[in-house]
Amino acid sequence: MKNTDVKYLEPHILSFLNNENAMNTLHDIRRGIERELIRTTPESRISNLPHPEELGSALTHPYITTDFAEAQLELVTPAMTERKTTFDSLASLHHFVATHLPDNEIMWGASMPPELPSDDEIKIAAYGTSNAGLHKVRYREGLANRYGKRMQLISGIHYNFSLPDSFWEILHSHIGSELSLNDFISERYFHLIRNVLRNGWIIPYLFGASPAVDKSYLINQEHALNLLDDETYYLPWATSLRLSNMGYSSNEQSFYPTSFNSKQEYLADLCHALTTPSERYTHLNGDQQLNASVLQLENELYGSVRPKIVSDQLRPLYAMCHHGIQYIELRSLDNNPLLPLGISEDQSYFLDAFLTYNALAPSPELTDSERELIARRQELVATEGRKEGLLLPTQQGDRELKELGLTLLSSMMPVASWLDNVFATEGHKQGIEREKVKFIDSNLTPSAQILTIMKDEKLSYKHVTQRLSEMHFKQHKDVEINKEEMAGLSRLVGESLAKQQRIETLQDMSFDEFIQKKNDLQCDCEIEEVVA
């Protein structure tokens, strides 16, 4: 019986792959990487020191900032067309940070946190005294009060990906779409997102690297994890505890599902969550969150993939309404502590093939029942994905994970060959072949490799991660980086600090007024109305 959960490319799309003009546009695919890391001490504990001034302003630096906690770094590369340049940029950021941290700190290379103190001792990120900075702090206070600080200290990698407008323009013509080009691009990104949701279980299976956690993460939590040693809890077949229900998730948001069937439906659902008070949060006062809505801000929406747009003038909801989607953010990648950068160029080849395939394969609208299947699949793969003979729910009934995975990789091959032809490489096909073997032998997955090290060497999660992090930290410090790039990063430190100071000096309203203005959200945005 043919597995129809995996979508094969349709004939008119296969003919599109032979379009020379379309092929030429692919050199303008852009990819950017964001990596979250925690600054830790030699004892594998979260640092209690402030964000180093030598790294610049966390509020205004474009590439080196903080996530939830003061000790939680976020390194952001620009979106670039050359894969090597993207990874060189990520390596440069790691080198710059490694050479500017206090002597007793390193960067924790895993997704699940190091040893954590009590919540009271975990410092929320600080951004200065400007309204914009205080707004970021208040938002994080809300996250802490809603979900707890521990969950917010789970770190990951975000892979930002866009196909060029020229590519979409040719596909628009090839299909004969009656939508405007801007609307067509947005709808195709939602098309891509729906398929990423369907097929996204493959990401934690292949790249999940969080099968275990330090016991301090679980204080005052109910859980079903097994004790590996005095300091470590784990699940024997887990791939990514980070992506499981005990990881980065929100029960409240599950009652307000967001549609990805069209831009209009997505924006309507998002605005509903941003303007609907939640009974769970109304007991918190104004100092404890930005507002009592299901979502304080758009960024609070959890999920493995997001539509994105960059705008300095408009909040994301309005920017997306007026200008459409610019790129997608794949959020389901764990930090792989076995890799110096947490992600590799080889992995990037696979991700590009995966995302391009999802942009081109058939993508019917998601029903409520299919969304439930997707959620069950992700939880099964996250918690027991390496279990021999594991069955995953599909619309045609249960199927073996191995069968589903190999079928999906096979269906991606025409796109991988196409990309290899364009870029004169074998990287995309090799990427798929490299991942195929993990379905044949689950011991080759990073989650299995990490558990093997822990068991064979009788070391805790904390000690294995500390050792790997120290090794990679030394590599980051020792690596040779382009002097011009280092000078540019040094210059950005001063510029970002000066920019923060200017912002703090030029306050034009009180913080209460600022909050009120930010919370004033209307859900009647007209799609046709274009604003600056």
Cite the ranges covered by each PLM segment:
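Extended, compositionally biased alpha-helical segments that mediate assembly or anchoring
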Residues: 425-532
